[in-house]
Amino acid sequence: MLYKGDTLYLDWLEDGIAELVFDAPGSVNKLDTATVASLGEAIGVLEQQSDLKGLLLRSNKAAFIVGADITEFLSLFLVPEEQLSQWLHFANSVFNRLEDLPVPTIAAVNGYALGGGCECVLATDYRLATPDLRIGLPETKLGIMPGFGGSVRMPRMLGADSALEIIAAGKDVGADQALKIGLVDGVVKAEKLVEGAKAILRQAINGDLDWKAKRQPKLEPLKLSKIEATMSFTIAKGMVAQTAGKHYPAPITAVKTIEAAARFGREEALNLENKSFVPLAHTNEARALVGIFLNDQYVKGKAKKLTKDVETPKQAAVLGAGIMGGGIAYQSAWKGVPVVMKDINDKSLTLGMTEAAKLLNKQLERGKIDGLKLAGVISTIHPTLDYAGFDRVDVVVEAVVENPKVKKAVLAETEQKVRPDTVLASNTSTIPISELANALERPENFCGMHFFNPVHRMPLVEIIRGEKSSDETIAKVVAWASKMGKTPIVVNDCPGFFVNRVLFPYFAGFSQLLRDGADFRKIDKVMEKQFGWPMGPAYLLDVVGIDTAHHAQAVMAAGFPQRMQKDYRDAIDALFDANRFGQKNGLGFWRYKEDSKGKPKKEEDAAVDDLLAEVSQPKRDFSEEEIIARMMIPMVNEVVRCLEEGIIATPAEADMALVYGLGFPPFHGGAFRWLDTLGSAKYLDMAQQYQHLGPLYEVPEGLRNKARHNEPYYPQVEPARAVGDLKTA
C-alpha cells in the first residue's frame, strides 16, 4: 500500500502501474474537502515514485464519484471570498498535479461522474467508461459553475459548442453521447473495465498511443478562430438569456467566463474560473438552489425511512377516469404498478384511456419506448364499469367530482368491495379528510392523496393524514407515490391541506389588488418577470379554472372564515358569473385559441375589463414593490401558520411543497428560504405597512417573535473552517 486515506487509497496494480481507488465509507464516493486534501497527499506520494509508469483511477462503489459533497456547500459559501478563492486555488493545484504527472493516466469510470467527479476525470489523459455512465457538470443548477477546472478543460477537450451545452444547462450525458462528443475514449462492459483501462495504459506506456499529445490541448488556449468564437459564444449567450433569464446568474456567468478564458492557457484560464466562481457562491440564488437540493434529499430520505417496513402496493385502482384519473392510471402503470380504472360511464373511461395512450405515444415519439413497451404498459391499465378486480387491489385512489356527498358515497361503496386491509385515498384538493372519513367503517385505512395537474409532470403528491389515518396507511400511500416517481410530502388535515391553504390567500391578495384598481396584466407581469413565478395569478387562475377556484374559495372561506371570508364581490365571482371559466372554455382573464400544436394561446380580450370594472375601483398604478408585497404577504403568513399549527412538519417540507406543487421560484428557495434571506425583521416591517388591509396581512405571533430575536427558520449555518484547516480536514 502506497497511501491510505479515509476515502481513497493508492497501491501498485502491476509493473510500474499504480491504481488510485476512491472508496469512501458509505454507499457513494463524494469529492468533499477531506477527499480533495487526501487526493493531494496521494499525488504527493506518486510524485516520489521514480519507477511509476502509469496511473489508473477507479472506484470501489457502484458509481465513480457522484459529485462534490453538497452538504458542505452552505458553510463553504459563508467563507470570506478571499479564503474561498485560496481554497479553490489549492483544490485546482491538486488536479493540476494529477494532470501534470510525468506518466499517462486513465480514469476507469463506472456509473456517475458528476460535478467534481467529472472534473477529476477531465484531469486524466484517457477515460474508459461502462454503459451505465452519466457524466456531466450540473453546477449551474445549484447557482454556481464548475470550480475545479471543468470550465477550462471541457471546452478544450470537446470544443466550445458541446462543452457550453453541458456546462450552461447543467447537463449530464450517457455513455453513447459521451463517446460521440469525445468526453470518454471508449465504453466497455463493467467486468472488462479495469482490464480495458490497463490495456490502454500499456499502449500509452509503450508509445503506441501519444498521451502527451492527448494532454496538450488542455494546457493551451482554446482552438477557435475569431469568427467561430463569436458565433459559438453569441449563440450560447442568447440561448442562456432565453432559458435561464435574469434570475439565474450562473449559466451566463459560466458562458462569459469560458469566452474570456478562451485565449489563455490553463493557469490564467483557471484564475478566471476562480474569479467567477467565488462571487456566484455568495449569491442568494446559490444558497436557495443548494437549499432546494438539500431539502429534496431530506424529503426523499424521510419518505424512505417511513416506508422501510411496508410493502409497496403491487396492484392499484383509480375511481373516476377522465383527465385526472387517466393521468394517475398512466403514472402508476408507467412505473410498474398495474391499475384498474373504474368509472360509471363509458365516455369517461374512454377519455381516461385516451389520456394514458396520449402520454405513452409522446414517449414513443421521443424514442423513450418502442411499440412493444407501449403495448405492455397500456395493457396493465384495466378500464371497468364495475368493481371487477377490486378484491385484488392494495390501494384505491378516488378522483371523482369535488363534492363531499358524491365522494362519501363512492368511498363508502368501494370500501365494501375491497379487502379489509386495502387502503383508500381521496384525491380531493380542499375537502377535509376527516370529514370524508366519517362515511367509512375503517377510517384508519383512509387518507388523502392530492395529485397536481398535469399528473405526469408535477412532482408533488400531498399525503394527508386524517384524524384516524393509521401510520401503516400513510406509509403504504407514500410507498406508492414514491414508486410512481413522485415526491410525497405528508401533511396534517385541514381545509385545503397545505398547498391550497396557502395558495388561496395569495389569490385573495390578487383579488384585493384588483378591487383597489390594479391591472391584472401588470400584476401578472410583475409576479412573473420580477418575482419569478412561472405564471402570474390571473394566468394561473385561468389554467386552474375559474369555476374550480370559485368553488375552492368557498370551501376555504368556510374553513377559515376569520381570514378567508370576504365581504365583497371579487374578480373571481365576476368571471364565474359571466361563465368565463378560463382555458377550459376559452374565456377567462384572457381569451384562448389553440396554436398550431393544439395548445391554448392567450390573447387580449377587452370584454374582461368591462366585467372587472363592476367589482373594481377606478384604475390606478401600483409600484412593483407594492404588488409583490401585497401578493406574497398573505401566502407567507399562511405558510408560517401551517408550520406553527403542525399542518406541515418542517420548513424544508413546506418549501419543497411550494416549489414542486406551485412552481414557487426555485431561485428564492421557497417561502421560508425567501423569508430567511429577506430577514424576519425586514419582513415584519414590510408586512406592517399593509396590516390595514385585513386579517390576511396580520403577521403570526411566532413570526413576530422570530423578528424580535432576529432568528431564521432554517438552522444557522456556520462558515467552514479556515482554508488551512480545509486542506487537511
Swiss-Prot record:
Pathway: Lipid metabolism; fatty acid beta-oxidation. Its EC number is 4.2.1.17, 5.1.2.3, 5.3.3.8, 1.1.1.35. InterPro entries: 3-OHacyl-CoA_DH_CS, 3-OHacyl-CoA_DH_NAD-bd, 3HC_DH_C, 6-PGluconate_DH-like_C_sf, ClpP/crotonase-like_dom_sf, Enoyl-CoA_hyd/isom_CS, Enoyl-CoA_hydra/iso, FA_oxidation_alpha_subunit. Substrate binds at residues 296, 500, 660. The lineage of its organism: Bacteria, Pseudomonadati, Pseudomonadota, Gammaproteobacteria, Enterobacterales. Residues 311-729 are annotated as: 3-hydroxyacyl-CoA dehydrogenase. GO terms for biological process: fatty acid beta-oxidation. It holds the Pfam family 3HCDH. Involved in the aerobic and anaerobic degradation of long-chain fatty acids via beta-oxidation cycle. Catalyzes the formation of 3-oxoacyl-CoA from enoyl-CoA via L-3-hydroxyacyl-CoA. It can also use D-3-hydroxyacyl-CoA and cis-3-enoyl-CoA as substrate. The gene is fadB. NAD(+) binds at residues 324, 343, 400-402, 407, 429, 453. In the N-terminal section; belongs to the enoyl-CoA hydratase/isomerase family. In the C-terminal section; belongs to the 3-hydroxyacyl-CoA dehydrogenase family. PANTHER family: TRIFUNCTIONAL ENZYME SUBUNIT ALPHA, TRIFUNCTIONAL ENZYME SUBUNIT ALPHA, MITOCHONDRIAL. PROSITE patterns: 3HCDH, ENOYL_COA_HYDRATASE. This is Fatty acid oxidation complex subunit alpha. Heterotetramer of two alpha chains (FadB) and two beta chains (FadA). The record marks 119, 139 as: Important for catalytic activity. It catalyses: a (3S)-3-hydroxyacyl-CoA + NAD(+) = a 3-oxoacyl-CoA + NADH + H(+); a (3S)-3-hydroxyacyl-CoA = a (2E)-enoyl-CoA + H2O; a 4-saturated-(3S)-3-hydroxyacyl-CoA = a (3E)-enoyl-CoA + H2O; (3S)-3-hydroxybutanoyl-CoA = (3R)-3-hydroxybutanoyl-CoA. The active site is at 450 (for 3-hydroxyacyl-coa dehydrogenase activity). It comes from the Bacteria. One of its GO terms (cellular component) is fatty acid beta-oxidation multienzyme complex. Keywords: Fatty acid metabolism, Isomerase, Lipid degradation, Lipid metabolism, Lyase, Multifunctional enzyme, NAD, Oxidoreductase. Residues 1-189 are annotated as: Enoyl-CoA hydratase/isomerase. It comes from Escherichia fergusonii (strain ATCC 35469 / DSM 13698 / CCUG 18766 / IAM 14443 / JCM 21226 / LMG 7866 / NBRC 102419 / NCTC 12128 / CDC 0568-73). GO terms for molecular function: 3-hydroxybutyryl-CoA epimerase activity; delta(3)-delta(2)-enoyl-CoA isomerase activity; enoyl-CoA hydratase activity; long-chain-3-hydroxyacyl-CoA dehydrogenase activity; NAD+ binding.
